[in-house]
Regions:
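Periplasmic c-type cytochrome electron-transfer domains
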Residues: 2-61, 130-141
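A generic secondary-structure boundary signal that marks alpha-helix termini
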Residues: 10, 39, 75, 121, ...
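Sequence/structural segment immediately N-terminal to covalent heme-attachment motifs in c-type
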Residues: 59-83, 89, 96, 111, ...
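Phosphate-coordinating loops and pocket residues in cytosolic domains that bind phosphorylated ligands
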Residues: 3, 79, 101
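A general structural signal marking secondary-structure boundaries and capping sites
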Residues: 5, 81, 120, 146-149
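Short, glycine/charged-enriched secondary-structure capping and boundary segments
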Residues: 16, 90-92
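Flexible coil segments in periplasmic/lumen-exposed cytochrome c-class electron-transfer proteins
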Residues: 71, 88, 96, 103-109, ...
């Protein structure tokens, strides 16, 4: 196998007219497993409108993943509780909005997906860093943070109330 004819990437080739051994990707080519044609899961929209529902079932595992990813990617700016008081603010950067303001509490979940995917204002896009499934998990965790800010005992299921000190 060592002594067989082959093209070594980034070395010149006399075979092709452009003299490159590494072939350019053909326009419109989609890598295997990367089609992402589910508008809700990968675009955060339903019929072109920001989604109001999650594309998957939100359970304890999704919430735990969302908390983990939120703490990694979001808390440096937004803080661990979503108040907009992360460590970058302490270093002089512009304060991001609190996740608890009415505008964001009332925003559809698709809005958060769009902002994480494409950026907004001073926030850069995170589509390349955070997988779509993880963006949805983060949104579920943000919704939990928002609910916790204004929760009452009536919001707690009766079976769980006895665990509250």
């Amino acid at each position: 196998m060592h002594d067989q004819p082959k093209y070594i990437p980034l070395r010149p080739s006399a075979f092709f007219n452009d003299a490159r051994s590494a072939r350019p990707v053909i326009e419109g080519t989609v890598a295997r497993g990367q089609l992402h044609d589910d508008e809700l899961m990968y675009g955060g929209k339903v019929n072109g409108q920001e989604a109001t529902v999650f594309p998957m079932r939100v359970d304890a595992a999704v919430m735990a993943r969302g908390q983990e990813r939120f703490n990694i990617y979001c808390s440096p700016c937004h803080g661990r509780t979503g108040q907009g008081d992360g460590m970058v603010v302490l270093r002089g950067y512009r304060r991001p909005p609190s996740m608890h303001q009415d505008r964001l509490r009332n925003a559809p979940v698709g809005h958060f997906f769009d902002v994480m995917s494409n950026g907004f204002g001073a926030m850069p896009d995170y589509a390349a860093q955070i997988a779509a499934e993880d963006r949805w998990a983060i949104i579920a965790y943000i919704r939990a943070l928002q609910l916790s800010e204004h929760a009452t005992i009536a919001d707690v299921p009766p079976a769980e109330r006895s665990r509250i000190p």
